[in-house]
Amino acid sequence: MSSRTLLSLPLLLLAVACTGTAGAGEGRSLRVDRDELVNTGGWTLTSASGGEAATAVRAPGIAFEMKFTRGEVSANGGCNELRGTYTASGRRMQFDIAITTRMSCTDDKNLADRSFVELLNREFKAELLEPMPYRLRLTADTGEVLEFQSQPLRF
């Protein structure tokens, strides 16, 4: 065997080992890192599936956005401000969120707020998907899937 062949084989094996396991076109799945959650301009809900609550948060005219700080999360999109805490460890996240304002909203927006809180107040398998912009996919053990896209920092 030539030295060129011997050098090519380890490089090929390294390339195969570094290939992501996510579906085609989906990019690489990373463990959730608090720095990645915090260092964005927020996270916008792009899809929700898996039940009635997921349907309610996708109602027309409603766009949920979350922002993370160290251990705290805030969200809005229906009508009210939502605040709470979260923990992230490896590929798991857990939320404890409540509605903190009681605005006079239309029924569909109130339902969306309640449904969003209901969807988030649990533990999820969490995946940070590349390439940029990052996407955060939360999959509940009960089957609901929420996907958020990171927004650029605004100065």
Model-derived regions: residue spans:
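Lipid interaction determinants
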Residues: 18-155
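Bacterial N-terminal signal peptides that target proteins for export
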Residues: 1-9
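Bacterial N-terminal signal peptides
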Residues: 8-17
